[in-house]
């Protein structure tokens, strides 16, 4: 299993070519050679194919909110959606510094995107209602959640607060 811990993202950002080597026993076999890394190598499953044109028709020109925008899943959503020409991105996260990093990435790669960075906790109903009223998102991608199950089994009340009650507030 490939453990990336952000390493792959850093290599890609530096425009470094990433290769994979087949298992030692397979070296030299027909079709087994050093090759460019594929998404399947990282996911260890077959990728899901999506109709990007269909998705783009829902995103282009729309106000899109992404909660958990500075997390690993949310940040990838930001990247994917930024390329689909939304009217406005409303990016919500409780982590100020990582959200600032998302802002810098947007400025580097999608300078023309109108993006609003909002530091907010999805469990704060008053704040979230204010954000919905002020920005009127047409679509919401809710990625604000705790995802490390074994750790959250020892922190059940926090997991329920964010993953369940936070989702109810967003809904």
Identify what each model region corresponds to.
Residues 2-19, 88-95, 134-135, 139, ...:
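NAD(P)-cofactor binding segment of oxidoreductase domains
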Residues 4-63, 70:
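Flexible, Lys/Arg-rich cytosolic regulatory linkers and terminal tails that connect or flank
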Residues 116-139:
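Conserved Rossmann-fold cofactor-binding substructure of NAD(P)-dependent oxidoreductases
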Residues 143-147:
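Conserved NAD(P)H cofactor-binding loop of Rossmann-fold oxidoreductase domains
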């Amino acid at each position: 299993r490939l453990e990336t811990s952000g390493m792959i993202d850093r290599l890609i950002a530096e425009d470094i070519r990433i290769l994979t080597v087949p298992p030692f026993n397979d070296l030299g076999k027909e079709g087994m050679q050093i090759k460019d890394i594929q998404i399947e190598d990282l996911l260890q499953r077959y990728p899901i194919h999506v109709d990007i044109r269909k998705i783009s028709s829902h995103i282009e020109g729309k106000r899109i909110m992404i909660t958990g925008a500075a997390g690993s899943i949310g940040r990838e959503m930001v990247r994917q959606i930024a390329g689909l020409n939304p009217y406005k991105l409303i990016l919500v996260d409780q982590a100020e510094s990582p959200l600032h990093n998302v802002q810098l990435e947007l400025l580097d790669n999608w300078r023309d995107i109108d993006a609003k960075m909002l530091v907010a906790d999805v469990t704060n109903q008053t704040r979230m209602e204010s954000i919905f009223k002020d920005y009127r998102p047409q679509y919401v991608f809710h990625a604000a959640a705790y995802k490390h199950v074994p750790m959250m089994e020892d922190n059940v009340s926090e997991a329920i607060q964010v993953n369940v009650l936070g989702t109810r507030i967003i809904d």
